[in-house]
Amino acid sequence: MSPDQSPLAGAGPRRPPLPRNPVGSHVPVAGGLHSVGLSYARDLGAEAVQVFVANPRGWATPTGNPAQDEAFRAACAAESIPAYVHAPYLINFGSHTGATVERSVESLRHSLRRGREIGALGVVVHTGSATGGRDRSVALAQVREHLLPLLDELTHDDDPFLLLEPTAGQGASLCSRTWDLGPYFEALDAHPRLGVCLDTCHVFAAGHDLTGPSGAHQTLDLLVDTVGEGRLKLIHANDSLDVVGAHKDRHANIGAGHIGEDPFRALMTHPATAGVPLVIETPGGKEGHATDVERLKKLRDT
């Protein structure tokens, strides 16, 4: 699949039609991907889902439940629900610690394999940081050495994209502003299986002001100028508890933070977001998630 194809391309003609921007949520899956995760998503009215396939704060690489995997995959296909996996937070290919890098390789390989098993379109991974006081160029060379081989392993038609998620700019972040993706993509040879997951809270906290009449569109223009058309595959739709440029990753419910509602509406009118799902990672449990999903749908449809 070429990078300029829609992230939702390939849906069969008998499946329900997709809205321009499916709106969904990260969902809990303890107890079963299908029996718990998709049930939660349906309760929200979610049109897209994101899941963990391992403890996000650990290195375990558990095997899946084949029955749950197949039921989840089949239901997502039948109902045209695009699914995504979020890799564990500990992954950092820029670490100065060899053990962390080795564990990062195995953890991400596991997430990519599990993504394929459940029919996920993409696996989201944070872009990491240059630890140990090392220069960014040294860390990016290490990213290339260890991450590019994992991308080259994605040889099946149903393998997921690897979606780089820039961070909020804390510490020695390798990638937070849109233009930071340029060296990152270059280090990975702009691999055809490489995409971007844009987190609105992160990019706002990193210094891109999404507010105002053209803030969201200018940010997306910069993204496209940096990585090219068709690379944006997923948006994490989160408001921010903190002001622009605060370098703090603290999510708020849609419209309840410093971003506000209007930028989310604007995001869903830019050419780069056509066909790109929005997934919330906001506070509030099921009730708060349902409210955020409904609010984003209204912003999209009105």
Model-derived features with residue positions:
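Conserved, mostly hydrophobic/aromatic
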Residues: A41, H86, S104, G115, ...
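Short, well-ordered coil/turn segments that N-cap beta-strands
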Residues: P17-V23, G45-E47, A77-A83, E117-L121, ...
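N-terminal pre-domain/capping segments
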Residues: M1-A87, I91-L112
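Short, electropositive alpha-helical surface patch
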Residues: A99-L112, D135-L148, R177-E186, S214-D221, ...
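Alpha-helix-loop-beta-strand connector modules within alpha/beta enzyme cores
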Residues: P66-V85, V143-D157, Y184-L188, H258-H270
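Active-site beta-loop-alpha junctions enriched in small/polar residues
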Residues: H26-A30, A54-P56, P88-L90, G128-A130, ...
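Acidic/histidine-rich catalytic cores of soluble enzymes
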Residues: V49, E145-I254
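Active-site acidic/histidine proton-transfer and metal-coordination neighborhood
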Residues: A77, F93-G195
